Amino acid sequence: MAPQKPETFMLSTEAQQALPHDAQVALQQVDNLKYFLISAPVDWQPDQYIRRFLLPTGEYVSCVLWNNLFHISGTDIVRCLSFRFQAFGRPVKNSKKFEEGIFSDLRNLKSGTDASLEEPKSAFLDFLYKNNCIRTQKKQKVFYWYSVPHDRLFLDALERDLKREKMGQEATTVAVSEPALSFQYDSSQSLYEQLTKTQQANSSSFSAQQPAFPPGQSSSPVMRNMDAMPRPI
């Protein structure tokens, strides 16, 4: 059973299968990005410091090795999310306000545990700037690669806009195509909570369908949710 995706978990199986070809291609491109976000730090050459992924938008997202740790910039996180909203059928129309919301969420990721706080024009920021990973060399956090809950950030940004629309306010993104047009918002609980429950239900169903294995044998494949983590405090 395929894991539920943040972009389509609110749709029925029939609705997911009936998505237009363009929407299916776009969601496959999101899967390609997610694979990069999982696998980028693997199998580097001894003298390698950066690995890039070309988004369909024409922008690059970079995994950067610095001080023996893998990093991603806030700018690249926003690029990932902007692309995901576009692929979802809800492109960004107010970039400034959209970015402000993402960077506000990123404040939950703390220096030292989730990110490196870099002083203005540090050697690291200079490297990132020269490689188009950041737009400015002002003091900022650069995030540890696996500390960033990408799905959670997507859902929280989507929920903010859906709430704005429900209250008659201007959203930072606008639904123009599927699956966004068919996405039904239930405001009784957060989107992330709804996704987590759906994933847990599917995981339980998956486990119940698996044959029993003798001790010492593994029931592969093991299902793992990349962003199944509590909100950082």
Residue ranges of each PLM-predicted region?
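Proline/serine/threonine-rich intrinsically disordered activation/regulatory regions
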Residues: M1-T75, Q169-I233
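Generic signal for short, ordered secondary-structure residues
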Residues: S12, Y60, V64, L81, ...
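Homeobox/homeodomain signature
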Residues: A23-L27, F88, R107, F124
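Beta-strand-rich binding-surface signature
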Residues: L27, K34, D47-R52, G58-V61, ...
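Charged/polar, solvent-exposed surface patches and flexible loops
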Residues: Q28, Y35, S39, R79, ...
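Short, amphipathic alpha-helical interface elements at domain boundaries
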Residues: V61-K97
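Chromatin/DNA-recognition segments of nuclear transcriptional regulators
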Residues: S95-S182
